Design a protein with these regions (language model features):
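Short coil/turn connectors at secondary-structure junctions
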Residues: 1-3, 30-32, 96, 129-131
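Walker A/P-loop phosphate-binding motif and the immediately C-terminal alpha-helix
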Residues: 3-41
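Secondary-structure boundary/capping motif
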Residues: 14-15, 45, 111
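Short, glycine/charged-enriched secondary-structure capping and boundary segments
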Residues: 21-22, 49-53, 115-116
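Signal for well-folded cores of large energy- and translation-related assemblies
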Residues: 27, 50, 123-127
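N-terminal phosphate/diphosphate-binding loop that engages ATP/GTP or pyrophosphate donors
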Residues: 28-96
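Phosphate-binding/switch loop-helix module in NTP-utilizing enzymes
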Residues: 76-131
């Protein structure tokens, strides 16, 4: 049986520390694989987990938008949606017992609309592989 666990609260209250401890506990109790999603604009769960993040969902969104703005085509004749899916698969960080996706910065002041949509779709597609 799989579960979704969300940790939310005000800044500086220990959400990242709690999440790191929770992930560690779940791994030690063999409740893996785990999909960790850091949806904070100031994401840093990777530092607690000791892994490096190459890119965020926000960064690949920017890359796709710039490709379109310049009038360039996506590699291999891909659509924007296919390009985003391909890039999302490439930014998934594989850790010991968990995988990590990082959302990154918002589109603009207070707006996470497009990034949240991408994140939601990606999580729905791959969540069946995780506990």
């Amino acid at each position: 049986m799989s579960y979704n666990i969300a940790v939310a609260g005000k800044g500086g209250t220990g959400k990242t520390s709690l999440t790191g401890l929770l992930i560690d506990t779940l791994i030690h109790e063999d409740k893996k694989p785990i999909l960790v999603v850091d949806a904070d604009a100031n994401a840093n769960i990777n530092e607690v987990l000791g892994v490096e993040v190459e890119a965020t969902i926000g960064q690949i969104r920017e890359e796709a938008n710039m490709t379109e703005k310049r009038g360039n085509s996506f590699p291999g004749g891909m659509t924007k949606a296919q390009f985003l899916q391909w890039k999302l698969n490439s930014i998934l960080v594989e850790g010991n017992g968990y995988d990590l996706l990082v959302m990154g910065r918002s589109e603009g002041e207070g707006c996470y609309c497009f990034v949240n949509g991408i994140l939601r779709e990606q999580v729905q597609k791959i969540s069946g592989q995780y506990n």
